[in-house]
Amino acid sequence: MFNKVLIANRGAIATRVTRTLKTLGVKAVAVFAEADRASLHVSQADEAYCLGEGSARETYLNQDKLFALMEQHGVDAVHPGYGFLSENPDFVKGCEARGIAFIGPTPEQMDTFGLKHTARTLAQKTGVPLLPGTDLLTDKNAALKAAEEIGYPVMLKSTAGGGGIGMQICENADSLDKAWDSVRRLSANNFSNDGVFIEKYIARA
């Protein structure tokens, strides 16, 4: 059993992990961006440390800051929650190199399944039925062409997304055109990966 676990996340998932850790008699360590100082996950934790000001990339996704806090405060495990660094194999390897347990999948499992487009390719190779879709798309015009071939509505998806973040239903070419930059930007800010692809969307499936 661990003695002290850092929760590398915020919001509802961080409060749920904190509640479970307290039930198990394990100290919960919260981290927070300055803008989240008054958040519930901060006040509920046994210890809480500020990651500074700035975007998610500068705070919750800043591995150097997180590792420094873990080592400084004697953390022996980290729970990533969902989103953020939860599917980042480099973060897991960094934890392992420092003797800090990562509560989650291995780097190898993440490399295989952490990116939706690679998981989709693996599923195709093994004969799993899938909705029509694309590989990674880097060009908006290619995305618009692919969507026309697949047929609207489609879902524009972040390959690295998690927790429902980085998905946008596009009913037509205009909505896909508008969603393209925003979904990629959201993905880059939350997952440090702006890769996107398209799948056919089935309403009320």
Predicted regions and their residues:
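N-terminal beta-alpha lobe that positions the nucleotide/phosphoryl donor
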Residues: 1-205
